């Protein structure tokens, strides 16, 4: 009886910790009428990505060690043609790519003359997809640095929200490199 009860208690405690962690993560507030910190044109100046692979529409907030970016998901996104025509769902790898682009903007924002640098992602860990992203959704990305940039290497944790719900999360390691 003791061992069985102990196992049940452990499962319950794990589930409680998981629920508490999910509720501690707050979605950033987003007012679509507020002027962005970076618009799509400024993002194009900093990132090498172009349509259809530029996956950040605007940045609404930048702090010393965090950034909040936006991606509006429309029915016209090219990936919906094949993923999936009858029930369009944004591919998880593209959610992670969009989050990485927001993280790249955070890293670039920390250097002088960011146009002269690029970020390259070296590692992505702990990726979790929690909910489907579909046409009509607005993804709000919050990415924060876990430690100061050292030797051109940055570690970050990112969350993607639709409304108040976390739809994706991941940890990243990126290198900042001067362009040739």
Provide a role label for each language-model segment.
Residues 3-25, 29-31, 35-36, 48, ...:
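HotDog/MaoC-like acyl-thioester-processing domains
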Residues 53-55, 139, 154:
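Hydrophobic core residues within well-ordered beta-strands of beta-rich domains
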Residues 59, 90-114:
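Active-site helix/loop of acyl-thioester processing domains in fatty-acid/polyketide metabolism
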Residues 56-57, 124, 155, 169:
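Hydrophobic residues on conserved beta-strands that form the core of alpha/beta folds
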Residues 51-90:
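Catalytic strand-loop segment that frames the active site of acyl-thioester-processing enzymes
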Residues 38-50, 116:
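Short aromatic-glycine motifs in intrinsically disordered, low-complexity regions
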Residues 35-37, 103-142, 167, 174:
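Hydrophobic beta-strand-centered segment that forms part of the acyl-chain substrate-binding groove
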